[in-house]
Amino acid sequence: MKSKLICIIMVIAFQAHFTMTVKADSVGEEKLQNNTQAKKTPADLKALPDSCEAKDFYKNFKILDMTKDKLGVTHYTLALSSGGYLTDNDEIKVHVTPDNKITFINGDLQQGQLRITNQIKITEKNAIEKAFEAIGQSEAHVKSYVGNPVKEKEIILNSRTKRLVYNIKLIFAEPEVASWIVQVDVETGAILKKQNMLSEVERADTHKDFQALGKGANRLLQRPLHVMKINDLFYLVDRTHKGLIRTFDLKHNTDTSFGKVVSNKTNMFTDPEFSSAVDAHFYASEVYEYYKNVHQLESLDGKGGEIDSFVHYGLNCNNAFWDGQEILYGDGDKKNFKPFSCAKTIVGHELTHAVIQYSAGLEYEGQSGALNESFADVFGYFIAPNHWLIGEDVCVRGSRDGRIRSIKDPDKYNQAAHMKDYESLPLTEEGDWGGVHYNSGIPNKAAYNTITKLGKEKTEQLYFRALKYYLTKKSQFTDAKKALQQAAKDLYGEDASKKVAEAWEAVGVN
């Protein structure tokens, strides 16, 4: 099946490669736009040997995205479909060199032809009602910060069950912040999947921009703090980037619609009441600058999107999380944790979840979920590389909870550091969606090994390249190893690729 699939993919990639025109975008890369639709089977497909069976399967592949990077490599993202419906998160990526050679193929190469086993019998409205019932809510009793709480409601093919489902995304702020994906069988109304996707830790021209000073929770002087003045008030709104950065105060509510942009009568945000907001605002700008300057990424989505931070979430909440739209920070219980916005590594970690969402889109369960957590940790380190710890600054001195995670020594902080310690936990909230936080210690240790072999500067470049071009939504640890090897080879050659392999083999990923 794998060799057959590769034959098919090669044909699709080359057909696309020779029927696309190139158009440069704002960040120096090239997005390939499909200007023509092939009206007949290309000669390359007809010439394939019968053993490839390409003629039977070719029509089931759809090209989702094509990007040409600065090295001249063209990256194609393909998905299987059946009956015109795309599968959920099943992706294959094909990478073609400037001299038209396929250098790397990754993704689910074992997937065969999919046959739909059900028929559409329930309506979209019924499916939405069942989705809300499945999470113990109703559409009338939830509140969304932006627009309708029903963000997506498309029919896709669940590749595990081979059944069509309404894939419904629900994001709301009341009665609690949530970002649910619920899959409802189009025939029976059965719930085939439900998952809360929260990623946790455990402009008007007449307005003027100013620089300000502020003190964070650790009483550090954060500057420059970019603010905006409207009439007689200074607001924590940073307009110095293409993407707007805003910081809101929830005043211990959990509904983001209650959030107000933090303001002050002067540009000195030094009173303790502003400390959480100062940290959140300052570090959000630092993260923006990191991705822009180091990776040429304009904001978290690569398109200059806004970054909204909400502080004082709930009462003594020991957490921070990205909910798919914005980042929310709890104040901590003051016994074990300080306000969660005071740790630059945590801010970097949570905002990197957004970068992951807009790039590889790693599915938040099992090994792909552990990779999601790990890449957020690793980039948290890249953003604040003073030590190997994630979240140290948020911990109260003397607290037994200590540092949240260690890239260098995961096993010191209740994480696996080798595949022999890997745990296959249930894919439920109680099972931490397959142990994504526990098992992420394994790729974290592999990242530490890579950094010690290649250095931070090279490692952060190859990690970003792998995240942007080579990882797929369902990537496993072995896929990450191969993706990082290929990225290292692209940028630094065979020797660097071998060192990446050694780093992962040292944690039992062969």
UniProtKB/Swiss-Prot annotation:
Keyword Nucleotide-binding: no
Record PROSITE patterns: ZINC_PROTEASE
SUPFAM superfamilies to which the protein is assigned, alphabetical: Metalloproteases ('zincins'), catalytic domain
Protein known as: Zinc metalloproteinase
Domain of life: Bacteria
Keywords (A to Z) from UniProt: Hydrolase, Metal-binding, Metalloprotease, Protease, Secreted, Signal, Zinc, Zymogen
GO molecular function, one term: metal ion binding
Job description of the protein: Probably linked to the pathogenesis of listerial infection.
Gene3D superfamilies for the chain: 3.10.170.10, Neutral Protease Domain 2
Propeptide boundaries: 25-200
Top-rank EC class of the record's enzyme: hydrolase
EC number: 3.4.24.-
UniProt KW Mitochondrion keyword: no
Family: Belongs to the peptidase M4 family.
One BP annotation, GO: proteolysis
Gene Ontology cellular component annotations, sorted alphabetically: extracellular region
Subcellular location: Secreted
Active site: E350, H437
Species this protein is from: Listeria monocytogenes serovar 1/2a (strain ATCC BAA-679 / EGD-e)
Induction note: The mpl and the listeriolysin genes being physically linked, their expression may be regulated in a similar manner.
Cofactor: Zn(2+)
Pfam families assigned to the protein according to its UniProt record, in alphabetical order: FTP, PepSY, Peptidase_M4, Peptidase_M4_C
